């Protein structure tokens, strides 16, 4: 190596180190995603508030052991309906650090599979959640379990909850090509009034 190339190589090394530092997660922007509702575009029988992805229960009575539902969207942002959409496909409930998960076996869900809230990336007996938690948001508003051809769909019927003022519908996966568009097209919305109740 000649003395004339040493400054060039030293400068190149400094530039490479600077580039690596910029690419480091420590230097990446760390703004957390904003929570909001995953809401059906069509309001169905709830013209005043529509239906949102919901974990069954309320307050200290959240039921992670039961299937998720499409529940009429609550005013503001309650913990059991507040989700963030992660870049790699998780639909995460930040208050509980749980992710929307298709009920399935061997990493595969079938049409009609329920949705449950499980630990993000969970690996436990009979639950390899990673492939059952990655969703793709299609341009038409459908939310597909990645690579499955199955889309998040609300049931055709609604019923009252413990309060006559509230309604719920079953929530499951249906073939994207045959799912009723009014019950399978979703949007991410941020409510104007934030409630943040647990």
For the regions a language model picked out, list residue spans one by one.
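Intrinsically disordered, low-complexity segments
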Residues: 1-2, 22, 179
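Bacterial N-terminal signal peptides
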Residues: 13-23
């Amino acid at each position: 190596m000649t003395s004339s190339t040493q400054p060039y190589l030293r400068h190149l090394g400094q530039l490479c180190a600077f580039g690596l530092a910029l690419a480091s997660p420590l230097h990446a922007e760390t703004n957390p995603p904003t929570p909001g509702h995953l809401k059906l575009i069509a309001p169905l029988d709830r013209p005043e508030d529509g239906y949102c992805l919901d974990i069954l229960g309320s307050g200290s009575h959240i039921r992670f052991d039961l299937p998720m539902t499409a529940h009429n969207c609550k005013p503001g942002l309650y913990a059991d309906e507040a989700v963030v959409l992660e870049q790699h496909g998780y639909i995460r409930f930040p208050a509980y650090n749980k992710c929307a998960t298709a009920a399935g076996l061997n990493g595969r869900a079938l049409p009609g599979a329920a949705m449950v809230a499980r630990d993000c990336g969970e690996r436990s007996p009979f639950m390899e959640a990673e492939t059952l938690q990655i969703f793709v948001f299609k341009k038409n508003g459908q939310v597909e379990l990645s690579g499955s051809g199955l889309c998040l769909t609300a049931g055709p019927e609604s019923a009252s909850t413990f309060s006559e003022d509230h309604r719920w519908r079953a929530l499951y996966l249906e073939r994207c090509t045959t799912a009723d568009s009014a019950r399978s097209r979703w949007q991410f919305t941020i409510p104007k009034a934030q409630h943040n109740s647990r």
